[in-house]
């Protein structure tokens, strides 16, 4: 089995300039998937920043009922952690819709983006989010040569 046929990749949050406000990512529909892994890429962190990644879930399409998942906060990052990633894996959320939230406070933190990887698809051959993923390829036992 190869990974790309059993997952769905979505860019859940675009880059956000330095700031101290929390940023909500896109709401993902988890129907058909057992889990989602969020990978938050951070840029420059200013001394005394308090930056972390958490997940929220809800039953409403528009996210009006989103609530934090208990214990889901990863971080906070150390001041020396500029240009590192935070990874949060949510397996079998109890509600249909899930989103990442990058929590920033005290001093500036740059967000390079958040990628969501939904996995354990109940129906294989999933299609990545065309609104955020431009291209995807699978190569099985490729020969060496020009790319």
Language model features: what each stretch is:
Residues 1-147:
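Surface-exposed, low-hydrophobicity beta-strand/loop segments enriched in small/polar/acidic residues
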């Amino acid at each position: 089995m190869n990974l790309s046929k059993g997952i769905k990749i979505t860019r859940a949050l675009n880059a956000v300039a330095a700031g101290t406000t929390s940023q909500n990512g896109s709401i993902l529909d988890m129907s058909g998937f057992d889990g989602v892994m969020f990978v938050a890429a951070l840029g420059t962190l200013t001394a005394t920043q308090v930056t972390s990644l958490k997940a929220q879930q809800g039953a409403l399409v528009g996210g009006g009922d989103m609530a934090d998942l208990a214990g889901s906060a990863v971080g906070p990052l150390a001041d020396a952690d500029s240009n590192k990633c935070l990874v949060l894996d949510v397996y079998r959320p109890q509600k249909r819709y899930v989103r990442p939230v990058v929590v920033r406070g005290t001093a500036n933190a740059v967000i390079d983006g958040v990628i969501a990887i939904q996995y354990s698809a109940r129906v294989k051959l999933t299609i990545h989010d065309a609104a955020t993923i431009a291209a995807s390829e699978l190569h099985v036992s490729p020969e060496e040569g020009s790319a």
